[in-house]
Amino acid sequence: ARPMLTAALYIPRILQYTGCKRREEVVAMSDKKIIIDVVVDVQKDFITGALANEQAQANVAHLAKVAKAHAEAGHWMFFTRDTHEDNYLDTREGRHLPVEHCIEGTDGWNFAPELEDAMDDTEPEVSHIVCKKTFGAYMLPSDILDELMAHNKAVDDIEKIIVYGYCTDICVISNAMVLRAAFPEVEIEIRSDCCAGVTPQSHQTALDALRACQFTIV
């Protein structure tokens, strides 16, 4: 099992690779806190395609502006991407939701043009696409840990994680719970103005559930 990545675990490696001589130098190097954005499934099929959503259509431009501003402010950006294969209807999810969507390589699988255009104008320090075959990206915490290690950082260096995207009541809440299980002491914020549920009612129900599970709703 992967050990919990703490500042204490990292210090010997940082000393080795940076040439720092004293523990105090390492602590000073890692003072800057990291804010991570997890942008969930902002793909055409969830906005104007197979699972078109009027609420997503109404706020995708705002979401893209927020993502761009956060990237320019130095946030680490992780984008989940729902990714299915041609046999989607034969899967468990497909049997319960028999609407083909986000089939890899199709137009609906692509990110929304508003998000693509916004991110084309920025160069985040970290920009990572996480493809996933189901609601929650189980590999997302591992990808975050890998980036922390690559930057000689620790979980303790995360100020907060901000989660937003589509749909609030399915993939947003699923990925928020994955992150909460992996990072129990990290503040996780849900940007409700950058989310949309299958319906306005299910959006609110998901936010209520997230609030009950100690996520910060803004």
Predicted features and spans:
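Conserved N-terminal glycine/acidic-rich loop preference
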Residues: 132-174, 196-218
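Short, Lys/Arg-enriched N-terminal segments with co-localized hydrophobic residues
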Residues: 1-3, 8-28
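Generic short N-terminal amphipathic or hydrophobic helices
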Residues: 10-13, 157, 187
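Histidine-anchored nucleotide/phosphate-binding helix
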Residues: 66-67, 173-181
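Active-site acidic carboxylates
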Residues: 23-129, 155, 185-189, 198-212, ...
